[in-house]
Structures are given as C-alpha cells and as structure tokens.
C-alpha cells in the first residue's frame, strides 16, 4: 500500500486535466461522473468500488470545507497546511482520533465527522501502509480464497 502515490497523482490529474476553460475537463462528461469525481477528489475522498460502502482517501484540495447533510449532520474537513506544494497527508484524525486507514465508510460520513488532515510537501510513506489500512479490493478477496 502506497497511498502517497495516489495523493501525488490525484492532485496532478486535478491540476492538469481540469480548469475553468471551455475544454476544462477531459473526455466525455458521462452523465456527470467526470465532474462528480473531481468534486469528491477535491474533498479528499472518492467512491472507487460501487457496491461497497467505502470512499478511498486522497488529499483534499481545500483548507476547510463543511458539508451540511440532509439528515442535519455535518462533515467538517480541515487541512490548514494544504497548498499546491503540500499535497501529501502526514496525518489524519477522524473525530479527534488518529486514523491510518485509507478509506472512510458511508456510515462515518452520514453520522457526521470531523476530518483533520495534516499536510506537507514530503510524503509520509509510513501512514496508511499497513495491510489493514487498505480499502476493499476484489483481487485481495480472490487471493484469500485460493
């Protein structure tokens, strides 16, 4: 598991492939999926595998965001050191507790959460590198069955 590589490439794609010009996003909009990917990625997480309740973590594009959910709960995302250079997650806390997993569950978000990302310009190659930190993977499931 090398989440810092995803953090690097997610930011590269968002900066290179999306902008405010008429041709500001790549390819076909595909019923809103391309722009939805960008919005999720800018928040710092995105759904990768339909059929699971997991959102894979990247790195937020904003320093502070609040999502006011329909159920009255709020998701707060803070990344005060975030910048163009500081694209790597050094540490993440969820509701004030250190969090090493590379995914959030739908339930965590819907119950309201406070995510605090500590960002830096150097990748933390230890954070989220454990096998237990990896999100769902069908190929991982197949390996266990063998």
Locate predicted features.
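Non-catalytic C-terminal accessory modules of carbohydrate-active enzymes
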Residues: 1-146
């Amino acid at each position: 598991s090398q989440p810092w590589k995803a953090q690097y490439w997610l930011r590269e794609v968002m900066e290179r492939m999306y902008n405010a010009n008429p041709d500001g996003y790549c390819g076909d909009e595909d019923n809103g999926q391309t722009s939805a990917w960008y919005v999720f990625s800018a928040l710092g997480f995105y759904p990768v595998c339909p059929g699971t309740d997991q959102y894979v973590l990247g790195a937020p594009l904003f320093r502070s965001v609040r999502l006011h959910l329909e159920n009255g709960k709020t998701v707060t995302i803070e990344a005060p050191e975030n910048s163009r250079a500081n694209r790597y997650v050094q540490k993440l806390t969820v509701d004030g507790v250190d969090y090493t997993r590379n995914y959030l569950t739908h339930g965590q978000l819907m119950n309201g959460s406070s995510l605090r990302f500590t960002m830096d310009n150097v990748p933390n190659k230890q954070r989220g590198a454990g096998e237990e930190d990896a999100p769902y993977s069908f190929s991982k499931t197949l390996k266990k069955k063998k």
